[in-house]
Amino acid sequence: MERTLDRVGVFAATHAAVAACDPLQARALVLQLPGLNRNKDVPGIVGLLREFLPVRGLPCGWGFVEAAAAMRDIGFFLGSLKRHGHEPAEVVPGLEPVLLDLARATNLPPRETLLHVTVWNPTAADAQRSYTGLPDEAHLLESVRISMAALEAAIALTVELFDVSLRSPEFAQRCDELEAYLQKMVESIVYAYRFISPQVFYDELRPFYEPIRVGGQSYLGPGAVEMPLFVLEHVLWGSQSDDQTYREFKETYLPYVLPAYRAVYARFSGEPALIDRALDEARAVGTRDEHVRAGLTALERVFKVLLRFRAPHLKLAERAYEVGQSGPEIGSGGYAPSMLGELLTLTYAARSRVRAALDES
C-alpha cells in the first residue's frame, strides 16, 4: 500500500504544481467569468480576457508548469465565448498566436483540455476557475480529480507489468496493485452519480464544451473521455484490435493526453497487448501451474473493476443525453454515448478470453 501511495503521490504533486501556479496573475479576473456568462455579456468576457492576455509573447523564463497554468486561465474564456456563439480567435485580437505559443510550450492542443479544467485547477473556493460557478460543475471537476492521479499510476504499472512473467508471483501482486488504482475510477463514477444532475449537465455545463477553431483546425472541448484510460486499455488489451471504430476512437483523443502517454500508445500500437502476452504464456506453460492460475485470476479481477466503471459510465452518459429536449446528441468529445457501449462490449470480450483460459484447466 505504501508503494501505491508513493506512486500516486508523484502524479498528484505534478497536478498540484500547475494548480498552484498563477503566472498571469489572473485569479481574481477569472473568478468574475461565471457572472459574465450568466449575463451572456460577450463584450465583458472579451474585455476581461484582454486584461491579462500576454499578447507581447510568453515570458522567456516560462516552463511547462507556467504555460499549462496560463492555458488553464485563458481556456475558460474560450469555452465561454463559444458557448455564446463566437469563435474565440475571431473576436479576441491577438488571441490565436498566444494559444499556438502555449500549445508549443506544452505539446498539447491550443485550448483548454480536461487536464486544465480539473487537476490543474485549484480546488479552493476562492481560487477554483469555473465556467458557471454552479455546484454541479464543481462536483464534475472533483469526480475527475478523484481518479486522475491513480489512473496515471495505473498506466505506469500496466507498462511495467507487460514485462513481468505470468509464472512469477509478482504478476499477481502487480495485478492486485493495478486493481486498487482502478478502483478510484469506480469511486469517481459513483461520486458523479450522487452529485451531478443530468439535467444541469446537459443544459448548463455541456454547452461550454463545444469545439473551437485555432490555426485553421478544430479542437474538441474538454470532456471526461479525454482521461487516458484508453491508453491503459490499449496496453492491457486493445493494441492489436481490428475494430476500426475503436481505433478511430483512440486516435481521436491522442492529441489531448500528455506526450508521455502518446509515446506509450505508439510503443504498443500493432504489438501484442499485455493480455495477448499473458495468454500466450499460459498456453505454453499450462494453466495448472499455481502461479499461472494466480496470475490469470488476478488479471481477471482487473477486468472486473474496469467493467464496474464502464457499465455505470455508460448509464450515466445515457441519462445525461436522455434529459436533453434539444441540442447535441453527442458528447463534447464528438461521440454518442453508444460508443461507451461499444467499449463495454470490447472489455467484456477481453475478460472472456481470460476466463476461457482459466476454464481450460
Curated annotation (Swiss-Prot):
It is an enzyme of class 1 (oxidoreductase). Pathway: Antibiotic biosynthesis. Transmembrane segments: none annotated. Gene3D superfamilies: 1.20.58.1320, 1.20.58.480. Monomer. Belongs to the PrnB family. This is Monodechloroaminopyrrolnitrin synthase PrnB. It comes from Pseudomonas fluorescens. The gene is prnB.
